[in-house]
Amino acid sequence: MSEKLFDVLPLYVANRDCRKRTKINQGGTSSGKTYSIMQLLFTRAMEKCGQVITVVGQDIPNLKKGSYRDAKNIRNASPVLQKWFPKVNEGERIFYCVNGSIIEFNSYKDAQDAKNGKRNILFVNEANGVPFDIFWQLYIRTSDEVFIDYNPSARFWVHEKLLNRNDVQLFISDHRQNTFLTPEQHAMIEGIEDDELWKVYARGATGAITGLIFPRFNVVDALPPREEWKMNV
């Protein structure tokens, strides 16, 4: 492919060149993580014939406002991609490549629903809105690569079940690496006043759950015997 597809951020290159099976993209708002992954999925679809690439979100409305909208914008801005992906089924949310590859966008109501279908590449968009049991069914039916992205408003199954695996690479990004933003957009994000929200959305750091009556707690596998904690009245 000698023609230029699109301009990319360093995050695109980092994900493209990573040899780990699972690429986790934790980031603040407007870091370019979803957009960069969608650009890469177009590239992956073009590189090999007959690829099945599945993009998963919490539900269809969120997909349409997020990664699916990004995908349409990326394709529509590139004459080269329009030649490679001449057909888009809006009803089924599928991009068809001339080499037989497809990029499909879907959500799943439960783990049983997620057992249907296999794929070469999986992208779980805003993964903290997708239950782990659904992710797992999709993950074990994916042959090649898995991409995950999210805003880290609080710890969830990615932190507990994936980050300690040897086949996982974590990328942390924030708006400062997104050179396509305007100075006003950067300033707006930097101007977030709440410290916890600033940490999450301006720096891509993992936040804590807010609004809890008991903000400090530990999760245990089981309670001790009742005789050790019951109250005598």
Question: Which residues make up each language-model segment?
Answer:
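Pre-Walker A (Motif I) flank of P-loop NTPase domains
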Residues: 18-25, 51
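Inter-Walker segment of RecA-like/P-loop motor cores
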Residues: 60-120, 206-207
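Walker A/P-loop NTP-binding motif
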Residues: 31-49, 70
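ATPase catalytic-site recognition across NTP-hydrolyzing enzymes
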Residues: 178-233
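Pre-Walker A adenine-sensing motif
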Residues: 1-21
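Hydrophobic residues in beta-strands of the RecA-like P-loop NTPase core, especially within AAA+ ATPase
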Residues: 123-124
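Signature of the SF2 helicase/ATPase Hel1-core->accessory helical subdomain module
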Residues: 128-178
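Conserved RecA-like ASCE P-loop NTPase motor core of nucleic-acid helicases/translocases
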Residues: 51-63
